[in-house]
Amino acid sequence: DVEGKRVDRSLSRIAKNMLAGEKFFFQEIIAKRGPGYVLFAHALPGGIVPVELDGSYSLRVQKDGFLAATQNIKIDTKMQNLSKGLFSGEGFFIVNISGKGTVFLSSYGAIHAVDIPEGEEMVIDNGHLVAWPEYMPYEIKKASSGWFSSMTSGEGLVCRFKGPGRVLI
């Protein structure tokens, strides 16, 4: 037996979720007769990965990337700066997840972890990002040397991440 109840959120939190492209309301599932399992699925075919957070950093997650979390995980939205908001393809608000516990992320297609070593950089198409730690610096760049070739190649803009850290794509 499980009990589901809507988690009450303030109007400002609901508005921020709407701006970030996330759900307005969250549901809390509680086991009524002790420990058990809850199974969940993404609406589209693709991968689901668990990410353990130890409370030492926040995780930035693309729009529609958050699926579920255990207790003690806080889901919020963060405003990006002007250039990242305009050019990232994700808008001015992104999902920020913090706390200690397990977060389940989902994506259309398989999710792969890419470890970027200290001092190295990696260019990733911003349309393929799922999540990255908030401590990893990144920039939004043109995919090619010129604007025309960037737009006509179908790539447009990319994110250049600097290690160390793990990016989920």
Predicted regions and their residues:
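Composition-driven recognition of glycine/serine/threonine/acidic- and proline-rich low-complexity segments
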Residues: D1-I169
